Amino acid sequence: MQDRQKAQDYRALLLADTPLIDVRAPIEFEQGAMPGAINLPLMMDDERAAVGTCYKRQGADAALALGHRLVCGDIRQQRLEAWKAAYQRFPNGYLCCARGGQRSHIVQRWLQETGIDCPLIEGGYKALRQTAIQATWQLAQKPILLIGGCTGSGKTQLVRQQPNGVDLEGLARHRGSSFGRTLNPQLSQASFENKLAVELLKINARQTLKRWVLEDEGRTIGANHLPECLRERMAQAPIAVVEDPFALRLERLREEYFIRMHHDFTHAYGDEAGWQAYSEYLHHGLFAIRRRLGLQRFAELTDTLDRALAEQLSSGSTDGHMAWLVPLLNEYYDPMYRYQLEKKAANIVFRGTWQDVANWLKAQ
């Protein structure tokens, strides 16, 4: 343990996907955590709140004493068993609290009493978080190439195929549009940024990196927003635009939103509940842009969506969805993206089909 405890290289710890036994309270963990960390709190939220109030009113010694009274007996033993099991599962793991202070030291000492020497992160989560922020800023200074194109152009797939591609939407667990949510809930903003930083570090470590390849995104991806240092660099980056035939885009969207999402919902929740969740997902996506469509047009497209869902439920056919998807693209998504792209026209360095852009990227 001593070798692991000395002179910690935070970047190396993040690059290695080092298991972290995070002993902070659940509310702290939810607000921000490192990829792969598991939350096994020393104190639960209410216990931490009580200790914090005691600290403010009576000082550190009284707060520490209260903490020991709250976590004692069977509660202490149950949590100790959970930490022991976690260390046995991840013998190369580290304990982590907010700042490498009393909580991780207390858990470390209790484990030592059982014969387990588990190192802790000096500086705690805050030190790792600062390392992630600094890494993102530094790596965002490298050249960036954006992949642009209207909805359904296969941009994400193209980015994923590049050895230097960073799938921002995958990291954010959201595909960017009003229909972009996935079955996996989005991470907190800090956790998203931490995951992005680790991904950048890993890709940078695998190769001699000339530039990043990213999808042309807005300021936000669902509830997550891009780090400002990265967004500023993307705003100035050259863009390769995918221009595929409309019919091909429709087939990609059919596969992604009507076939795959239906499958994912029913696989997760069963046929009946999954169908209900899938239907609500499509309705929610349309409802989210009702004001931009205009209430009358929204009502018309909603009726068309209902008919398409009825047809899909009865026959399995997704053809009916084209009756609302086509006008949605023509009247809303395509004009919106083309307007945004026009403002960045000076940054466009290549236009072509998906395959043209893929070939162009290989030649760079």
Swiss-Prot record:
Keywords noted in UniProt: Selenium, Transferase
Pfam families found in the cross-reference section: Rhodanese
Signal peptide (UniProt feature, chain positions): none
Listed result of changing residue 155 to A: Lack of geranylation activity
EC number(s) stated in the UniProt entry for this protein: 2.9.1.3
Record carries keyword Transferase: yes
GO biological process, one term: tRNA wobble uridine modification
InterPro entries documented for this protein: Rhodanese-like_dom, Rhodanese-like_dom_sf, SelU
Top-level taxon of the source organism: Bacteria
Gene3D superfamilies from the UniProt entry: Rhodanese-like domain
Impact when changing residue 66 to P: Increases geranylation activity
GO-annotated molecular function: transferase activity, transferring alkyl or aryl (other than methyl) groups; tRNA 2-selenouridine synthase activity
Phenotype upon changing residue 63 to P: Increases geranylation activity
Note: It was also suggested that 2-thiourine geranylation and 2-thiouridine selenation in the tRNA chain may occur independently, in two distinc metabolic processes.
Assembly and interaction partners: Monomer.
Domain notes: Composed of a rhodanese domain and a P-loop domain, which probably binds geranyl diphosphate. The two activities are mechanistically different, but the rhodanese domain is important for both.
Cited function: Involved in the post-transcriptional modification of the uridine at the wobble position (U34) of tRNA(Lys), tRNA(Glu) and tRNA(Gln). Catalyzes the conversion of 2-thiouridine (S2U-RNA) to 2-selenouridine (Se2U-RNA). Acts in a two-step process involving geranylation of 2-thiouridine (S2U) to S-geranyl-2-thiouridine (geS2U) and subsequent selenation of the latter derivative to 2-selenouridine (Se2U) in the tRNA chain.
NCBIfam families, alphabetized: PRK11784.1-1 (NF008749), PRK11784.1-3 (NF008751), tRNA_sel_U_synt (TIGR03167)
Family from the record: Belongs to the SelU family.
Protein name: tRNA 2-selenouridine synthase
